[in-house]
């Protein structure tokens, strides 16, 4: 297990890089670009480690070759130089982007095997380059288990190519679908090694890019859709506004009706109270008429005759009033009938003269009546004075 800096980028020229690590580091070859036929060589990296160094240099021993078993080396402390590795990191590590080169004949050199077969030892992977055209590479970052940091071996990067791409092949002791831990004894102690099969990188096709014309068509299409949606929204907003105005007007009408209903209820309560008061008065009047009716039965016969006479007088008075009304109607009808007659008719003139004489006579009669009354009053006064004069000597 290696603890190193978060980002390790393979140099395009295959130069050596240095990192600080605790544990076992395995080598990963780095492809160096070349203009013609070239042989890819692994890039070396000097590491400072507390563990078993690589077999190339350092103090201590280990499994220098997979084909032969050696005695287990002692635990060493020193500087060891190894090939470029893809260590197990704690953090997000950017993957190197090696560029493929066009070569007629190219041979690959495999990296050195791991220096010490520990719990986290991984077999080295060798890259066999083939004839390919160079293309931009896409780097895949590792997503780890602890909050987005990578806790494990970094994934290999896939080189995008239009024709042929270089596919790295994993060299492992066991080629299987799933990694299987193996227990191997060598020397004085047993080493528990876990061999994993690296995932083959597949060619990733470049994403199709939109041209300016296609982008303009999409923008125009979206603009038309947006305008249609805007029209629909405007229509719906106008309709909702009309509904809102209608609701407001209906709300005002409902409030007015509510006020009118409250007023009617108040008037109804007042009317009920007045009706109750009238009913109470009527009941009191009935209670008062009860004793009077009892007393009326005990009245003598004279009172009964007087009451009958009073009823007859009332009847006569009603008849006289009816007769006077009839006379007025007859006079009005005669006047209406006389309006249409000719005023030059001598009969009409004679009638007018007679009416004037009649009115004069009536006035004379009323005046004579008044004079006679005054004379009578004067005579009465004179008589009284005479009596007073004759009574004086006595």
From Swiss-Prot:
Residues 45-73 are annotated as: Disordered. Residues 22-117 are annotated as: 5 X 2 AA repeats of F-G. The keyword Coiled coil applies. Sequence repeats lie at residues 22-23, 50-51, 75-76, 77-78, 116-117. GO terms for cellular component: centrosome; chromatin; cytoplasm; nuclear envelope; nuclear pore central transport channel; spindle pole. It is found in: Nucleus; Chromosome; Nucleus envelope; Nucleus, Nuclear pore complex. GO terms for molecular function: chromatin DNA binding; phospholipid binding; structural constituent of nuclear pore. Gene3D superfamilies: 1.20.5.170. Keywords: Chromosome, Coiled coil, Cytoplasm, Cytoskeleton, mRNA transport, Nuclear pore complex, Nucleus, Protein transport, Repeat, Translocation, Transport. Disruption phenotype: RNAi-mediated knockdown in oocytes results in increased nuclear size. RNAi-mediated knockdown in oocytes and nurse cells results in irregular distribution of chromatin to the nuclear periphery disrupting karyosome morphology. Simultaneous RNAi-mediated knockdown of nucleoporin Nup154 restores normal karyosome formation. GO terms for biological process: chromosome attachment to the nuclear envelope; mRNA transport; oocyte karyosome formation; protein import into nucleus; regulation of nucleus size; RNA export from nucleus. InterPro entries: NSP1/NUP62, Nucleoporin_NSP1_C. Residues 45-57 have a biased composition (Low complexity). Expressed in adult male accessory glands (at protein level). Pfam families: Nsp1_C (PF05064). Belongs to the nucleoporin NSP1/NUP62 family. This is Nuclear pore glycoprotein p62. It comes from Drosophila melanogaster. The gene is Nup62.
């Amino acid at each position: 297990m290696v603890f190193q800096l978060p980002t390790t980028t393979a140099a395009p020229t295959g130069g050596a890089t240095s990192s600080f690590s605790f544990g076992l580091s395995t080598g990963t070859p780095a492809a160096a670009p070349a203009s013609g036929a070239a042989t890819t060589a692994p890039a070396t990296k000097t590491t400072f480690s507390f563990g078993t160094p690589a077999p190339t240099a350092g103090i201590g021993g280990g499994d220098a070759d997979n084909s032969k078993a050696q005695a287990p080396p002692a635990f060493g402390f020193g500087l060891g130089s190894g090939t470029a590795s893809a260590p197990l990191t704690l953090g997000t590590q950017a993957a190197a982007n090696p560029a493929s080169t066009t070569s007629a004949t190219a041979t690959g050199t495999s990296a050195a095997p791991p220096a010490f077969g520990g719990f986290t030892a991984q077999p080295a992977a060798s890259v066999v380059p083939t004839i390919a055209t160079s293309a931009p590479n896409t780097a895949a970052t590792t997503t780890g288990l602890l909050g987005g940091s990578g806790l494990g071996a970094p994934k290999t990067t896939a080189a995008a190519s239009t024709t042929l791409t270089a596919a790295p092949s994993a060299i492992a002791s066991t080629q299987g679908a799933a990694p299987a831990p193996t227990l191997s004894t060598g020397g004085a102690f047993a080493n528990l090694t876990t061999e994993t099969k690296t995932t083959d990188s597949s060619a990733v096709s470049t994403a199709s890019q939109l041209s300016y014309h296609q982008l303009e068509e999409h923008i125009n299409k979206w603009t038309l859709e947006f305008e249609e949606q805007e029209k629909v929204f405007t229509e719906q907003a106008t309709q909702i506004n009309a509904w809102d105005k209608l609701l407001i007007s209906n709300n005002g009408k409902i409030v007015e009706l509510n006020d009118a209903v409250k007023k009617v209820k108040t008037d109804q309560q007042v009317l009920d109270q007045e009706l109750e008061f009238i009913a109470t008065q009527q009941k009191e009047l009935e209670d008062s008429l009860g004793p009077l009716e009892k007393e009326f039965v005990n009245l003598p016969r004279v009172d009964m005759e007087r009451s009958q006479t009073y009823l007859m007088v009332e009847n006569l008075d009603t008849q006289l009033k009816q007769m006077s009304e009839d006379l007025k109607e007859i006079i009005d009808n005669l006047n209406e009938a006389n309006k249409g007659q000719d005023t030059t008719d001598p009969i009409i003139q004679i009638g007018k003269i007679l009416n004037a004489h009649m009115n004069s006579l009536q006035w004379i009669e009323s005046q004579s009546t008044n004079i006679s009354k005054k004379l009578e009053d004067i005579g009465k006064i004179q008589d009284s004075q005479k009596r007073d004069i004759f009574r004086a000597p006595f």
